[in-house]
Amino acid sequence: MNDLVADINNVLTKCGVAEKISLSDITITKKTVSDLVKPNAKLSDAITNFLWPSITSATVYHYTSREAAESILNSGIFRLNNIANRYTDGEILTFCETHDLKGYLEKDVNGDPKYRYLIMPNTFYASFTDVSLTEEQEEYFWRNFAACDGVRLKIEITAANPNFRKMRYEQTTGKPICLLSNLTRCIRAKYSREFILKGISRLCSFYLSGKDYGIENEYRALYRVWEGFGPQPKTDGALSYIELPLNSMSECGYQLTISEVHAKEQPKMPSSYIFSKRGA
């Protein structure tokens, strides 16, 4: 199977990935190639870090309604929301369809795709954007996420959790990421096996249609919930969420500090926050 390793390294090199693997870094079965049971998932980590590098700190904006902003500012709590709230927006689906992840797309007896109950229920996230925005982007965010009397929070994020990453956007509908596509195609065609990327169920959440969402240039903080381990979700009616206390490193691995508040009129908030009036 040294030829298989050589082919994998050849694909990595051609796609710009510097790392190389050896035979001991992967597990080869009759049907699959993976590093799922390896203590150091060298191949999967190399691919993930190349396509979706982790971000340890960033200054970002979060656009939201006045009501939500006042809740955050006065309670000192920021929420990660359940990704199932965006079931109809192409979350996870876009990645699975484009990259032919049939297992997640299979439907149950109720007609629901498997990803809806295998991935969505325990995936929580928050969306942010870059502070260097064009005039067009600024208008888009105010209009779509903070219309009328909405608020923009400038936030300093420090992440111990590796799942603070930038989104990848599909520039051509149905065209997969070349690195993943080339690797999968090579292993399937030459060795009649399927390549399994460790963490794929998590990475599905960092991919959306560029045509629909590319303007957002989104940073995403993600947290996966596991029963009996770490923070557990709370509910507010039909919605579930994870609470992040501001100004300290949370159990989820994120520290959020609000440095400025921008709006047309100052929201109700503690005097310790810096307010900047937004222009018309």
Residues of each region from the PLM?
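Partner-binding and oligomerization surfaces adjacent to conserved cores of proteins
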Residues: M1-A280
